[in-house]
Amino acid sequence: MIELRGLSKHYKLSGDVLVKAVDKVDLTVEEGEFAMIIGRSGSGKTTLLSLIGGLTKPTAGSVHVDGVDLWSMSDSEQSRFRAEKIGFVFQIPSLLPTLTVLDNVKLPTMFSRGVDKVGEKALALLEMVGLSEKAHAYPSQLSVGQQKRVALARALMNGPEIVLADEPTSDLDKATELEIMSLIGKVHEEGPRTLVMVTHNLELVNYATRVRTMDNGVLSKSAGQ
């Protein structure tokens, strides 16, 4: 379960201009739920996702994941907790160009023991996203849609209970968009995993179990399914 209470992130610009990227957000995402946050570019949804995942420190408020306050931990404790509990799918896949597709998927567990099992799991995840034949290719040899599928496989490498996805279908044609959403739906259902996705695309709302809208840093009280 994810619980946000009074969560805010404010930035001060030159001339003492205060930007409320996220402002007083209250949100509970139940275990196994697929929550989707819809908003235009600049609405604060990516910042909110970063706050949920512990990548950005809030100005005020709290983030609890499975009852644990993320910001009550030391940096090392938080990093360990995040690595074990949360998988991230970023808008830009950011695959390392000098590593093969397989090694990119293995990155979250690169220093784990049992290398053979790590390799087997990475191959199984590539099979799941339909890219096992690209295991020894390099990111530059993949389309944007294929890179996003690799990023999804990488996010699942540690077996996270929670997946946070930032605009995973951006810059894709309709057919590839549907492929990615079908995979995300599969990830949610087969876990079952708690999934929070942010997007500007209203056409995707039917994939979620609950939908909220965001504008100017404020999350709607109700826009749900």
Can you annotate each of these PLM segments?
Residues I2, S8-V25, V29-M214:
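ABC family nucleotide-binding domain
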Residues V211-A223:
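H-loop (His-switch) and adjacent beta-strand-loop-beta switch element
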